[in-house]
Amino acid sequence: MNLSIVVAKVVRENAQYKYKLVGKGERYLVQHQEGDNSGNAVMKYLTPYAKEPVVIEGVSLQKHSEIVESFGEVIYKAVVQHVVEDFDTGRLHKSKRNYFINGDSYSDAYESLLAEANNWVGLFEIISLSKTNIIEVLYDNCN
């Protein structure tokens, strides 16, 4: 599975029933199969809510990233450095991974990340945990 961040401009209805173009675009995290166009998933999702056609401004593939399944309204991004020892050579191998976590607060996201850490092998260090401006996580053709 691949993860991509898709930025889309959309005209939405606001509280006064007037239509408004979303300024800088909305960001969506899309989990998709390799080779699939993640922008199409966002367009399909947003089209019923948009007055005019949705414009995809950009798509960026998130390498070395995964989603931690959790509940919450805000999406956080954690950068974690993993350290694994090669038993044949005795060398330590370090790699960084990004984890996207739903939570209502930093502590919720941190606890969800630590729960996920029970499945990891080797040592790890949480380098950063920050709030993102991603609106929603979409799953496209993920069976």
Residue ranges and their predicted role:
Residues 1-28, 69-95:
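Short aromatic-glycine-(Arg/Gly/Cys) micro-motifs in beta-strand/loop hairpins
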Residues 11-13, 38, 83-85, 104-106, ...:
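Generic structural motif
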Residues 38-44, 107-111:
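Short amphipathic alpha-helices within nucleic acid-binding modules
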